[in-house]
Curated annotation (Swiss-Prot):
The lineage of its organism: Eukaryota, Viridiplantae, Streptophyta, Embryophyta, Tracheophyta. It holds the Pfam family PGI. One of its GO terms (molecular function) is carbohydrate derivative binding. This is Glucose-6-phosphate isomerase, cytosolic. Its EC number is 5.3.1.9. Keywords: Cytoplasm, Gluconeogenesis, Glycolysis, Isomerase. Disulfide bonds: none annotated.
Amino acid sequence: MAPSTLICDTDSWQNLKTHVAEIKKTHLRDLMSDADRCKSMMVEFDGLLLDYSRQNATHDTMSKLFQLAEASHLKDKINQMFNGEHINSTENRSVLHVALRASRDAVINGDGKNVVPDVWQVLDKIRDFSEKIRSGSWVGVTGKPLTNVVAVGIGGSFLGPLFVHTALQTESEAAECAKGRQLRFLANVDPIDVAKNISGLNPETTLVVVVSKTFTTAETMLNARTLREWISSALGPAAVAKHMVAVSTNLTLVEKFGIDPKNAFAFWDWVGGRYSVCSAVGVLPLSLQYGFPIVEKFLKGASSIDQHFHSAPLEKNLPVLLGLLSLWNVSFLGHPARAILPYCQALEKFAPHIQQVSMESNGKGVSIDGVVLPFEAGEIDFGEPGTNGQHSFYQLIHQGRVIPCDFIGIAKSQQPVYLKGEVVSNHDELMSNFFAQPDALAYGKTQEELQKENISPHLVPHKTFTGNRPSLSLLLPSLTAYNVGQLLAIYEHRVAVEGFVWGINSFDQWGVELGKSLANQVRKQLHASRTNGEAVKGFNFSTTTVMAKYLQETSDVPAELPTKLP
């Protein structure tokens, strides 16, 4: 396929478009009655079981999707990523987050150099530093151990590490390693977030990790300056060097900020923010909380999926299957949204993280060559742990819009609870819903079935479920650090597969720039209005009116800002 050719112009794409009419004649009630079909749509790898039999798909559908993958040169693109080629073409960068969790003896080249030794140099530095903090050999300026960590970052510097932290908090081995310690994440520039994160913390026992590649991210640096003031006002300016460290590549600005450059932990241009949880961005705060050995298990889990993604045939490749099925639902069946439904409270921050990974990666309107797409790429991701979501938005999923669902279940609970006299354990009660919901969506309930139950005729339309609503189920054996790493990598690569087939660049994010540049203009106006009383000007009528109202309501804010902390 020539570089300028869009995937929608290929025979494979057109064959799938034609195939849609055939699929719309089917119903999952009938498709699910074919045991051979269902068996062929189950894939196991390293303890994980994927069941995609409840997708609106037949053997022919899958064959055509694999042909589409071939037409898009999916295997070649996967190899290009692992080989360090500059597949992020708009920024002329490699995409090598797989190197972040590679084994020490692996060889992964970027710009003609094996990057794995550099990765492990940083990992070893994190191991040593986190052990010093956790053992108490590195103490704060007053001699007290640093038992509290506040990680300051935003976007990928926050959502990924928070997901992993939340997933590990209730895992027995990780929880034991974290006893007596706290890890918090400060992301929002809203001062309320600052107040919440320092509430109850003692500066004497707190270490702040500032995460910013360039050390210029506006929100992160304002929050960092706020916490620097919180520390220095309590302990003196010299305390900053003992109580603040950085994850950054801009050592000049790190030192200017007051942090010893020796306490800066590097990452690289080939690591995108939303793919950075396995870099120092996530590994440092997580190692401070749980110890490096726990985090290393997480990295090994991710690495196992990396190797599977790179080497498994498409028909047995978990991320490839998930990516192709998402693309089938979005681009052919017309379902733009996806619900991520983990039946595990420890995964409550998983959907928000994948929301960023997916929507920032694939929310693009042009091809990698800059050609406007005649189809919509990307999907709208949202989710909530089960069973909470059942009492929130499942009504729409069952009887409103068709939204493909990912059900994620854990065989062994992190916190098993049994009550004498109960029919099942608490976890079995949870998993009863995990198994029931996909079938409810697939089969639905017909008017005939309701009439046999003697339902009042006027209620029959309201209690009818059309069914034929697609989902897939992913069952993990447990939720250890290793399994968390597996889950992360599956979804990272799933997103890449979609982008590779759509022919877009999943590794840039120019869409976040325009709003930031406009915010700079607003910031200047607010400053001028506060200090000089200048009227709001240079904006459209609506913005001018609302900004003037805002300034009026906050006229008590002093022109020269004194220091005021929560």
